[in-house]
Regions:
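Non-transmembrane, aqueous-exposed alpha-helical and coiled segments at domain scale
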Residues: 68-73, 243, 258, 262, ...
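Short beta-strand-loop/turn "lid" adjacent to the catalytic site in phosphate-handling enzymes
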Residues: 50-97
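Glycine-rich phosphate-binding/hydrolytic loop that grips phosphoryl groups
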Residues: 10-14, 245, 249, 296-322
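Glycine-rich nucleotide/cofactor/substrate-binding loop typically near the N-terminus or early
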Residues: 20-69
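Glycine-rich beta-strand-to-loop/alpha-helix junction loops that act as flexible
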Residues: 10, 79-82, 147-149, 266-276, ...
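A contiguous, well-structured pocket-lining segment that forms one wall/lid of small-molecule binding clefts
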Residues: 184-267, 277-289
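Extreme N-terminal starter segment of soluble prokaryotic enzymes
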Residues: 1-6
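Glycine-rich phosphate-binding loop plus the immediately following alpha-helix
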Residues: 17-20, 31-46, 103, 109-136, ...
Length: 322
């Protein structure tokens, strides 16, 4: 019998639900990957009952797709839920692991963030353990950066995690700007941002408003989304491409700051939606002097986080629901 795990993930951007079917018996083996879109309005909804229902129903649908021919070999499902709010001592996720377990007849690991907090962690980022499992090796130093809605990093030296933290906004401000101007859900390849100009004065103001955040930390999305409201007057006077260009540079600066904090390691590996933003990656490569690559040679960047939660379920680092 195979020992398979299903990992699910909907990030802070809420753009889709990703899932993968994996095995850890002889290193990581990815058997299947799928993505489902959410119903209209999910991305910006404040209705927790709607969010609860949607993430639960879509998760059941996605699990059933992934395990169609392997159901008897699945040990557990990793369901992190949809983060509603997060701070260092409590995390709130939407979704029902109990219903998923009952409907699929498969045990579900969930409440990963509060489990981590209860065991001395900050509840985020949770992916460093998977970074270590996947990428650490003797005689190397690597910085692994996940650019999701929020950007987080893991600094690996030899086979150890030296440091990990949330470090700044990833795609969240870019996606919000696109929505606010009715330009779509995201800026494909950073094409619109690449046509804009950086507002240096505004960039320095944005940096000053979040410069006091310490490492290590776990950031709630509201920390960065509040920048839009705080600086509304300045944004009202600017073209969307200039706002996008300036927000892109904000992400670049926060990545550079953490890169320097970690001692400027020679190798930097990226994954997450931001790694597919050509303009953002172009600016990162111009700013950071390191060997830069993406994780895609090991696993598709899009499914790293869902595989990471499957790994945490495999290691039993969550609450089990049957």
């Amino acid at each position: 019998m195979k020992n398979l795990y299903v990992g699910l993930m909907s990030g802070t951007s809420r753009d889709s639900l990703d899932g993968c079917l994996v095995s850890f018996e002889k290193g990581l083996s990815v058997l299947a990957c799928e993505t489902l879109s959410f119903s209209e309005g999910y991305q910006t909804s404040q209705d927790q009952a709607f969010i609860d229902r949607e993430i639960t129903i879509k998760s059941i649908e996605l699990v059933n797709k992934l395990i169609e021919t392997e159901r008897q070999n699945v040990v557990a499902i990793a369901f992190p839920g949809q983060t509603i709010s997060h701070n260092d001592d409590f995390s709130l996720q939407a979704g029902s692991p109990e219903i998923i377990a009952k409907q699929t007849k498969i045990p579900v690991y969930s409440d990963f963030r509060n489990f981590d907090i209860a065991n001395g962690g900050k509840g985020a980022p949770l992916i460093p353990a998977f970074h270590k499992y996947l990428l650490s090796e003797k005689g190397t130093e690597k910085l692994v950066l996940n650019i999701g809605g929020i950007c987080n990093g893991t600094y690996l030296k030899d086979e150890n995690i030296v440091h990990s933290s949330d470090i700044g906004p990833g795609n969240c401000l870019l996606d919000a700007t696109m929505r606010n101007f009715n330009l779509g859900k995201f800026d494909l390849d950073g094409a619109l941002a690449s046509k804009g100009n950086i507002d240096s004065f505004l960039l320095e103001e944005l940096l000053s408003q979040i410069e006091s955040l310490p490492y290590p930390r776990a950031d709630d999305l509201s920390v960065y989304m509040s920048l839009i409201e705080k600086n509304k007057k300045a944004f009202d006077e600017k073209a969307p491409e200039d706002i996008l260009c300036t927000f892109t540079e904000l992400t670049v600066k926060k990545i550079q700051e953490y890169f320097n904090f970690c001692g400027a390691p020679e190798t930097v590996v990226f994954h997450g939606g931001g790694a597919e933003n050509k303009y953002l990656m172009h600016r990162i490569k111009e700013t950071i002097k390191a060997e830069i690559s993406t994780i895609d040679s090991v696993i598709s960047s899009k499914y790293v986080e869902s595989a990471a939660f499957a790994y945490l379920a495999f290691k039993e680092r969550a609450v089990l629901f049957k």
